[in-house]
Amino acid sequence: LIQTSMGAAKYMGGYKLCKALIEELVESMGITVPVAIHLDHGHYDDALECIRVGYTSVMFDGSHLPVEENLEKAAKVVEFAHANGVSVEAEVGTIGGEEDGIVGDGELAPIEDAKAMVATGVDFLAAGIGNIHGPYPENWSGLHLDHLQKLTEAVPNFPIVLHGGSGIPDDQIQAAIKLGVAKVNVNTECQI
């Protein structure tokens, strides 16, 4: 799974070029395992554009929007994506820190919002459980694994995505995986 952000794609010349570069990399390196190309933390229009140019997966991040608008736009992204064979990740609650201009305070994902987002037809759910983007401060209290357990009980057997994986202690990541996290995003440690 290779993820691009809105900022990285803009810097590199756009989503179509990013997709072409990744495909060329896969071919020139002789990579034989399937490679998914994913948009991370995309706004509505960016998610639709990535679907149009052939990304295999998108994350629509409407967590900064009012809940009803987030759900409505997620459902529209799902409809267009699934019609084109593309999977969709969406976020409820907010992941703390900043990514591509989306700033989150790091609230815990409300359980009812998570259930409503899953009902839109998304394939993966990113949910705030105390995780943040960027370096973790020394006074960080850790993941709210009790909240993650409530979340996974509310949406059983549904793939949960843990953003902000850089800097989370291994034992907490392992505990989160045992509770239902199916994908862990890391990026900060690749940049520092």
Regions found by a protein language model. Give the residues of each.
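Glycine-rich beta-strand-to-loop/alpha-helix junction loops that act as flexible
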Residues: 162-166
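Alpha/beta enzyme core
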Residues: 1-8, 15-32, 41-158, 170-181, ...
